[in-house]
């Protein structure tokens, strides 16, 4: 009898039901039986069905050896109600199946359960808040996109280092992170981790993301005691004092210092019944209705114990703090009772471990819509929780560290240079559009050369630069972008035209300076012969 492992994913409970029904119909031994002087072919007794199906479920890795015979009978009752089987006279539709010699058979056809139909979803990538995100409330439609081809001035700023200018840097504080931003980061990264562990393309069919409260996650991480138990801000949501005292009594048995009532024979059974009654009358299971599919999906990972523990850790972070606290206290009590050798038997028909699972599985996990396998799935989950509750109900440090580093990074200052992305002003909004392969090849080949050519022309025509500075920049440009430079100056003659040789100036005649300049009306001696 081989039961395929049903992995994590949407509708896992329905997939398990269909898998079990198919295997039961295909493998259940059928033979001839007599009843009231009449023979019936291809049928089986109720007891034979219970024996065979019980062994199948116990050997299945989807359910495990903790499945009881009583649970198997409950499942066969649901088989009878859903017309998976019928009695030998063709009656079905009610859960009157009992573990006896009554005869049953398979109907000609046994329709499998259909999967719930949901509208197709678009695969949305969980988005983390970024530095440049617009403030909350800004429309996300038609957000301008940076132009693909920059103008020469922007390119000049970007590549100023290549032509010899290093601009001064400055520190820029990004937009202040609000409390809502931080909460959204916690929610987004937590769900992203869960999605990655489950190996799903989307959590939409496993979890209603809108019902996930980021405040619960943050509270469950930081508001904890030294023992790791959640501390509630609202004390009205605490366990009643009498329930907490009863749980401490059984957890510390036989040292019950909290209870002042005198002990009597069977006292521990009454205390246990009090605790079971309180948890059994909760309005909602501790793992909540809306997280049922998420926890059932994680059950498909139990073959990889470490991965399953990580997935359960994250799922338990999504719980309301009061539910997480009640679950922590309950699991600690259950584990201590099972390990306590001095504890008297709490039930004559079951062992202590089986009793814990059967008593509390439904108040821990159940479906709002009464899924047919929810009892078996809940028992499987509670068994795993009891064995690993200390790890599962701890805060996952890897996730906490990653989120804290992310928040710190967004709050950190950043070094920016003039002309970097944040300084680009868009002349007109442009939007992404699909281009042809030919246009892509052209942009890849020539898209970057046009701004460089324009930049080179600006250097050439810049009248503010001296010839020496201009030659220096052109030499650096030639070294950085030889193809563009070669296209502009294909020959040495074309380069020489840029710097024509100036004619050498003629040397000026030196005039002798007179020692004594002429004075006005100065009389001169006449020489007569």
From Swiss-Prot:
Database matches in Gene3D superfamilies: Rho GTPase activation protein, Winged helix-like DNA-binding domain superfamily/Winged helix DNA-binding domain
GO terms, molecular function: GTPase activator activity
Keywords recorded for this protein, A-Z: GTPase activation, Phosphoprotein
UniProt-annotated site: Arginine finger, residues: 231
InterPro entries assigned: DEP_dom, Rho_GTPase_activation_prot, RhoGAP_dom, WH-like_DNA-bd_sf, WH_DNA-bd_sf
Domain DEP, first and last residues per copy: 24-108
Ranges of residues in domain Rho-GAP: 201-393
Protein origin, superkingdom: Eukaryota
Modified residues (Phosphoserine): 160, 436
A Pfam match: DEP
Keyword Cell inner membrane: no
An example Gene Ontology biological process: intracellular signal transduction
PANTHER family found in the cross-reference section: DEP DOMAIN-CONTAINING, DEP DOMAIN-CONTAINING PROTEIN 1B
Protein name (database record): DEP domain-containing protein 1B
Organism this protein belongs to: Macaca fascicularis (Crab-eating macaque)
Lineage: Eukaryota, Metazoa, Chordata, Craniata, Vertebrata
């Amino acid at each position: 009898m081989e039961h395929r492992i049903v992995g994590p994913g949407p509708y896992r409970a329905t997939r398990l039901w269909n898998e079990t029904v198919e295997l039961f119909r295909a493998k259940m031994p059928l033979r001839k039986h007599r009843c009231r002087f009449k023979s019936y072919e291809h049928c089986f007794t109720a007891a034979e069905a219970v024996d065979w199906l019980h062994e199948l479920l116990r050997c299945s890795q989807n359910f495990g050896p903790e499945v009881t015979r009583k649970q198997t009978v409950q499942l066969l009752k649901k088989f009878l109600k859903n017309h998976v089987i019928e009695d030998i006279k063709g009656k079905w539709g009610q859960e009157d199946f009992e573990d006896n010699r009554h005869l049953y058979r398979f109907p000609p056809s046994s329709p499998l359960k259909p999967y719930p139909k949901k509208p197709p979803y678009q695969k949305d990538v969980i988005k983390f808040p970024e530095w440049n995100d617009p403030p909350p409330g800004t429309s996300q439609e038609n957000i301008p996109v940076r132009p693909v081809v920059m103008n020469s001035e922007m390119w000049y700023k970007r590549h100023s280092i290549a032509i010899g200018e290093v601009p001064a840097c400055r520190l820029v504080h990004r937009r202040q992170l609000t409390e809502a931003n931080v909460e959204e980061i916690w929610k987004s990264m937590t769900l992203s981790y869960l999605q990655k562990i489950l190996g799903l393309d989307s959590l939409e069919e496993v979890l209603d993301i809108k019902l996930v409260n980021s405040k619960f996650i943050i509270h469950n991480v930081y508001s904890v005691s030294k023992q790791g138990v959640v501390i509630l801000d609202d004390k009205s949501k605490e366990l009643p004092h009498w329930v907490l005292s009863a749980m401490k009594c059984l957890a510390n048995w036989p040292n019950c210092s909290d209870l002042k009532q005198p002990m009597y024979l069977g006292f521990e059974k009454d205390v246990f019944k009090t605790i079971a009654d309180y948890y059994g009358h909760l309005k909602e299971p501790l793992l909540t209705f809306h997280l049922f599919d998420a926890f059932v999906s994680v059950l498909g990972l139990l073959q990889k114990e470490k991965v399953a523990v990580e997935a359960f850790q994250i799922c338990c972070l999504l719980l309301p703090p009061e539910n997480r606290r009640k679950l922590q206290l309950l699991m600690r009590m259950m584990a201590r009772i099972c390990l306590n050798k001095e504890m008297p038997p709490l039930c004559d028909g079951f062992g202590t471990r089986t009793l814990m699972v059967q008593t509390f599985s439904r108040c821990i996990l159940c479906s709002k819509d009464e899924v047919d396998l929810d009892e078996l799935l809940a028992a499987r989950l509670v068994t795993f929780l009891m064995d690993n509750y200390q790890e599962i109900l701890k805060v996952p440090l890897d996730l906490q560290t990653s989120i804290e580093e992310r928040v710190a990074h967004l709050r950190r200052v950043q070094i920016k240079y003039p002309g970097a992305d944040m300084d680009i002003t868009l002349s007109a909004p442009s939007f992404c559009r699909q281009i042809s392969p030919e246009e892509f090849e052209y942009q890849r080949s020539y898209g970057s050369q046009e701004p460089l050519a324009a930049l080179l022309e600006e250097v050439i025509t810049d009248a503010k630069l001296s010839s020496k500075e201009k030659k220096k920049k052109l030499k650096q440009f030639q070294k950085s972008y030889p193809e563009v430079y070669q296209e502009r100056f294909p020959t040495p003659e074309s380069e020489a035209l840029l710097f024509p040789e100036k004619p050498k100036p003629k040397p000026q005649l030196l005039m002798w300076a007179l020692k004594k300049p002429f004075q006005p009306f100065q009389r001169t001696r006449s020489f007569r012969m």
